[in-house]
Amino acid sequence: MAVAAMAERGRLSHAAPAPSTEGLPRAFLQSLRTLFDILDDRQRGYVHLREIESRWQGADARELPCGVLEGLRQVAPANGYLTFERFVAGLRTSLLKADGGQRDQARVAARPGDQSSLQQRLMFAPADEPRTVLERKPLPLSACPASGGPSGTSRNPELLCVPVEAASCPTETERPLSKALEQIPSADLGAAACKTLGKGTGEARQAPRARGERRRHTITNGVDCSLLKQMKELDQEQEVLLQGLEMMARGRDWYQQQLQRVQERQRRLSQSRAAADFGAEGSPRPLGRLLPKVQEVARCLGELLTAACSGRALPSSSLGPLGPPSPSTPVWQQQTILMLKEQNRLLTQEVTDKSERITQLEQEKSALIKQLFEARALSQQDSGPLDSTFI
């Protein structure tokens, strides 16, 4: 049966002459080709009329002009399969019928001296509005001129939207098919011109977008750049604080080692044989070379703590009278800093005194050793002649 249906479709297609698409704009044909490809989802090259009726009927297609389906039924063969050429011919027939019917109604309703028939003239919808098929909109009441002549046209910019053939030849019953379809892009441009001129007359109308211009979208839920910047700054601060904490721990260990060394030296000097022990062990590296750096570190640390205390007090005062500030914390910190400075000064002075004392003891030791050797040499010289005389 399928073979018979295919043979029937081939016989009918050869019997009836295929409609032509000559005289139609290329852009219009491309748009219709896209629509036909959507309907022909199986890529067979033809679409059955029942499929089009099932898609273009119902609640979703209530705005579809009624003449479109009748035009497709007229050009459809007996088997109901529509090729692209027949599909274009059906749409062409529906457009011509709709245009001719509107002109007939306008000609019957027209009276001498009455310009109300211009209200019934239709224009094509702008190209930027979404649509599946061609639709037409009636002109507003403001489009009717107050008086005949060129002055009325110049005072009413809406008359620019009226097709040239309809304005010049109201008694014409039927226009050529190619001219009727070629008016589609010109009508779109005329609608755009009417909207642009409408802004000058006080009508709030939005200018249409140009052909090919895409609609712009704004990202509202994207990544916040300021939040990323703040997170990066916080990470840097955390890294710096961790490095400072590590250096403070190492510095604390070094300070404790130096204190233990100083206390050990004090203990040795307090004993009776401190000089001899020190001379036996050797002189360690003196702290006097590092004293300027130690003092500089203590000064920088004190300035840092002072600036940090003042920096924490500023936001609380700028927020307003939320509560009385606690003066005990800054005073306690200042006292701690002063105490550390005093201890550092005392330790430095003590180390300096001890170093001078050690130097003095070493000099005395050297002098005593020299005197001892001199005394031994003199004693040996004095005892030599006495021994020879006795023998």
Curated annotation (Swiss-Prot):
Region (Disordered): 1-20
The keyword Hydrolase is annotated on this UniProt entry: no
Tissue: Expressed in the retina. Expressed in retinal progenitor cells and newly differentiated neurons but not in mature retinal cells (at protein level).
Organism (species): Mus musculus (Mouse)
Name of the protein: Suppressor APC domain-containing protein 2
Keyword Cell division in record: yes
A GO CC term assigned to this protein in UniProt: nucleolus
One of the GO biological process terms: symmetric cell division
Positions of modified residues (Phosphoserine): 283
InterPro entries per record: Suppressor_APCD_1/2 (IPR026828)
Coiled coil (residue ranges): 226-277, 340-381
PTM-bearing positions, type Phosphothreonine: 218
Protein keywords: Cell cycle, Cell division, Cell junction, Cell membrane, Coiled coil, Cytoplasm, Membrane, Mitosis, Nucleus, Phosphoprotein, Tight junction
Function: Plays a role in planar mitotic spindle orientation in retinal progenitor cells (RPCs) and promotes the production of symmetric terminal divisions. Negatively regulates the mitotic apical cortex localization of GPSM2. Involved also in positive regulation of cell proliferation and tumor cell growth.
Entry's localization field: Cytoplasm; Nucleus; Cytoplasm, Cell cortex; Apical cell membrane
Subunit structure as annotated in this protein's UniProt entry: Interacts with a spindle orientation complex at least composed of GNAI1, GPSM2 and NUMA1. Interacts with GPSM2 (via TPR motifs); this interaction is required to prevent GPSM2 anchoring at the mitotic apical cortex and is inhibited in presence of NUMA1 in a dose dependent manner. Interacts with PARD3.
